[in-house]
Design a protein with these regions (language model features):
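Carbohydrate-active catalytic/glycan-binding domains of CAZyme proteins
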Residues: 1-371
């Protein structure tokens, strides 16, 4: 889909559905006024050679009418750099024009230890594209899995020219904990890119990477200021006294505004009948985990009416894997319960009878894989 505006601060259109299948669409506007869309797609069933076989397609794009031009689609990458090696999940394509030539950069290898970034070149936006002889230009696949403080699964990248005239690449990666679990999820990283030769190369993109907080030259570090979210070590405290909810709080499968009410006493959550075990919108505010070591706490006033009512805090991977720590009712009594859901099966780890006349503070502390 496409949404558009003349002012990025407001006036965005309703989503415009583009008529093709696949994932990761990217628009390219050429300097001659023409435009194109590239995206990942599955090959025709009769042409699928192995599991994970995917293609990159390109379409002419009608800017005036916000649609792809029917019948203009063409496969410009089949499988990946070398289909004979059965590469998987070629995706996330972007086209760049430099010195009169067209460069197609894609992710290859799938979200995991074989993830990488590869690049192709052509004299025409619709190909044919030839792969660089130094592919991949970014990956962590060749290094020991047990290396310390690692960044892994590097790929799914994009390029930008910075205010210093140099190129930089942003890409996705992970910072797994000591048991190789990815509780912080996929995150965005940045590296300088050397494009002094024919092809761009991520500097340090082919050596073992470690997370740092260096900023590109010429860029002011506004982390935690002027609306930018903090990074590194920090304390975030929200008493919900503002009339507008902080953007760091997010909803799941639906807008948070559907269940939050900012009152003079703080935040009031209007509960849905669904819960976090279901694949439905839930009346839950989430804060994305940014650290492998952290402490988080919430203070609430809550008096459940029956055994179906439950409120508290959660450490949430998805609807099948999570912890909940909160208050419910059994008979005439109120209980504080710690419950774990694993593979969709819930089990109570502990419970204690409590009074609900005063506010209750719930806290979780994480240290690597221990919560």
């Amino acid at each position: 889909m496409v949404v558009k505006t003349k002012n990025p601060e407001n006036g965005w259109s309703d989503p415009i559905k583009l008529q093709f299948e696949g994932i990761d669409p990217s628009l390219f506007f050429d300097d001659n006024g023409k435009a194109y869309v590239v995206h990942n797609d599955a090959p025709a069933k009769a042409n699928e050679r192995y599991s994970g076989h995917r293609v990159i397609k390109i379409w002419d794009y009608d800017v005036e009418n916000d649609k792809v031009v029917p019948g203009t689609d063409r496969i410009i990458v089949n499988g990946g750099v070398n289909i004979e090696e059965k590469p998987i999940w070629i995706e996330a394509p972007h086209i760049y024009k430099k010195d009169g030539r067209y460069y197609l950069m894609c992710a290859e290898g799938g979200t995991g230890g074989w993830h990488s970034e590869v690049i192709f070149v052509s004299d025409h936006p619709k190909g044919p594209y030839l792969p660089a002889n130094n592919n991949p230009i970014l990956t962590q696949r060749y290094f020991p899995a047990n290396r310390a403080d690692k960044v892994d699964w590097a790929g799914h990248a994009d390029l930008v020219e910075g205010p210093d005239g140099k190129y930089y690449g942003v890409f996705l990666g992970i910072r797994p904990n000591e048991k190789n679990r990815v509780n912080t999820g996929r995150e965005t990283f940045i590296l300088p890119v050397d494009w002094s030769g024919t092809f761009p190369v991520f500097e340090n993109g082919l050596i073992p990477m470690k997370p740092t907080l260096k900023m590109p030259s010429g860029v002011e570090n506004q982390t935690g200021k002027n609306g930018y979210l903090p990074s590194g070590n920090f304390v975030f405290k929200d008493d919900f006294s503002d009339k507008t909810l902080d953007l760091r709080w997010i909803g799941l499968r639906g807008p948070r505004e559907d269940f939050v009410d900012m009152t003079d006493k703080g935040l009031r959550i209007i509960p849905f009948t669904s819960n976090i075990n279901e694949v439905k919108p839930t009346s839950t505010l989430f804060y994305r985990q940014q650290h492998n070591q952290f402490t988080a706490a919430a203070t609430m006033e809550y008096k459940p009416k029956n055994e179906k009512d439950f409120a508290g805090i959660t450490c949430y991977q998805n609807e099948r894997y999570h912890y909940v720590f909160g208050i419910t009712k059994k008979g005439k009594d109120y209980y504080l319960i710690l419950q774990r859901t694993e593979k969709g099966q819930a089990s109570v780890l502990g419970e204690v009878k409590i009074e609900t006349e005063k506010p209750v503070t719930l806290q979780v502390t994480a240290n690597g894989d221990d919560y």
